[in-house]
């Protein structure tokens, strides 16, 4: 995916993307992979004027992304959008199934519909996209939430293929690192939110997909 010297790169998602960013999305990009990528681009291509914007928001599901898409994404007219969403769509079925104090989980058919609408609106606005699949940093195939998460990841993969989008599969990325001896606890303390090492892995894989010219 080509990124030219005056492009705008926007990171969209939930807490995995947010990582304590400045509310504006531009000044401080948080402690995660968006900041790492912005730093790598700035150091490797100092002559470029690539604007990086972080619009990750903690707790977001696809429902929330849809509700803020115009203001946070389309109005910024990005050239490239990375989207990491779906974890909270699944997680709320497992961590808070009975509470009424937060959004409930998003059924998979609604997830598909929401995600497809997000993709359509962003691409029709002229941006290229990279989808990051939902994941759970747990190698136990019998873990129920992991099983569900992978079903949502399949939806993400299907839509990436349908709309000819770039795809970064995070479950295989983390499982590959664990297979090589990296502990799951090195990658995440709670199996969802990446550690510095986990974010580094994401940032490096995304940088491989960017052809900065």
Feature names for model-found ranges:
Residues 2-5, 36-51, 60-213:
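Alpha-helical cap/lid subdomain in secreted, periplasmic
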Residues 2-28:
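Short glycine-rich His-centered loop
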Residues 17, 57-58:
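Basic, amphipathic N-terminal segments that precede the first structured/catalytic domain
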Residues 54:
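Conserved SAM-binding motif I beta-strand of class I
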């Amino acid at each position: 995916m080509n990124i030219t010297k005056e492009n705008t790169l926007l990171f969209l998602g939930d807490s995995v993307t947010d990582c304590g960013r400045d509310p504006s999305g531009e000044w401080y990009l948080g402690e995660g992979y968006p900041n790492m990528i912005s730093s790598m681009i700035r150091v490797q291509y100092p002559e470029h004027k690539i604007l990086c914007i972080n619009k990750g928001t903690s707790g977001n599901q696809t429902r929330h992304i849809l509700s803020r898409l115009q203001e946070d994404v389309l109005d910024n007219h990005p050239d490239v959008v990375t989207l990491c969403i779906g974890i909270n769509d699944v997680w709320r079925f497992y961590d808070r199934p009975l509470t009424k104090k937060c959004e409930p989980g998003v059924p998979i058919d609604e997830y598909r519909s929401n995600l497809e609408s997000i993709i359509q609106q962003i691409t029709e606005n002229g941006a290229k996209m990279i989808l990051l699949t939902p994941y759970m940093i747990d190698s136990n195939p019998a873990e129920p939430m992991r099983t569900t998460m992978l079903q949502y990841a399949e939806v993400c993969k299907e839509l990436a293929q349908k709309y000819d989008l770039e795809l970064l599969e995070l479950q295989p990325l983390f499982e590959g690192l664990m297979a090589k001896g990296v502990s799951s606890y090195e990658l995440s303390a709670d199996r969802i939110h990446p550690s510095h090492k986990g974010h580094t892995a994401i940032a490096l894989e995304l940088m491989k997909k960017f052809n900065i010219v």
